[in-house]
Curated annotation (Swiss-Prot):
Cofactor dependence: [4Fe-4S] cluster
Coiled coil: none
Name of the protein this chain belongs to: tRNA-2-methylthio-N(6)-dimethylallyladenosine synthase
Gene that produces this protein: miaB
Lineage: Bacteria, Pseudomonadati, Campylobacterota, Epsilonproteobacteria, Campylobacterales
PROSITE patterns listed in its UniProt record: MTTASE_N, MTTASE_RADICAL, RADICAL_SAM, TRAM
Amino acid sequence: MKVYIETMGCAMNSRDSEHLLSELSKLDYKETSDPKMADLILINTCSVREKPERKLFSEIGQFAKIKKPNAKIGVCGCTASHMGADILKKAPSVSFVLGARNVSKISQVIHKEKAVEVAIDYDESAYAFEFFEKKAQIRSLLNISIGCDKKCAYCIVPHTRGKEISIPMDLILKEAEKLANNGTKELMLLGQNVNNYGVRFSSEHAKVGFSDLLDKLSEIQGIERIRFTSPHPLHMNDAFLERFAQNPKVCKSIHMPLQSGSSAVLKMMRRGYSKEWFLNRVERLKALVPEVGISTDIIVGFPNESDKDFEDTMEVLEKVRFDTLYSFIYSPRPFTEAGAWKERVPLEISSLRLERLQNRHKEILEEKAKLEVGKTHVVLVENRREMDGQIVGFEGRSDTGKFIEVTCKEKKNPGELVRVEIISHSKGRLMATTKGN
């Protein structure tokens, strides 16, 4: 039996797809990259914005046309959670619907016609996803929590993934050790608010915080680097930032989702912090780790966002000079506070704001890239670079999250840590050669 999985959206969804495959492997399913050959087609969905949700029904239609006569189509993930049985009504070719909090039930629902399992109070945190042998990965994803207790006015995630629960540390360490034994060098820890880890477990467990978890993971032999996403700025107190700075295996790059640079908009968004708080946290972080790489999310066109509000966002962009920017026009979502508001920023204005934001960020990246020439970084080799069938180097990321293309004559294998020197840049991209390895 063969399964094809189409994954939309975030890293959390990618990890959920791995869990789906893990469960199905117990029933002797093998993954295929060709949906035409699959006995089971799974679409793991995203509902953070409207666009991927619209794409879902287009994908269902395409798969229905090309699938084998008896193949089943299942819709999983966040859109499944909030649309539930409505998906079956809109797309009769779908055999079952499986919500984001119900991944472990996949082996049950594939045997039920028109099944709908979308309860968000189902506790998957106590479920030990069994490690299954797969192709060795240099970088692996690892859940440390599920759900979200925040009530951001624009976000549907609490409705699709339920209340926040931390996964017991012993299960996390056990899986991390198995990943390390299978060749993983870098862990990416996943959670809606990873740095809030330990606030609530599904059952009685010894109190442990996120920084303690990072320290324990750092002790695992074979794990060279640890990253995490997505932390919440509200939980970036001095103690957390100091532990982040001190742990040598924790990469010195961090995601700090700003969302807006306007304190007024942040208040409407129910983010719990102000522009001043955010800038204070960045200042403290850079004092501890001057070379830190910072990425962020920004939403433009949030209801009632004024010209001044947007200028506040541009001001924060100039002050922080983010290394990576994920930026979007506000998308109203069902079951959210802001989704019910009548006030809307005209699309033309939102589009112009987004264009200006992104263009300025591109300029900032170019300015920062110029300053990198002559500097050295340690890169984790991810892929070899080839030209005319010959290996000419490799590419990978630095500790600070910079993607670097390296030219070298020596053969370097994926998973190696290699010191390189930046020699040039192009449109924000960094090029390097090996140095003193």
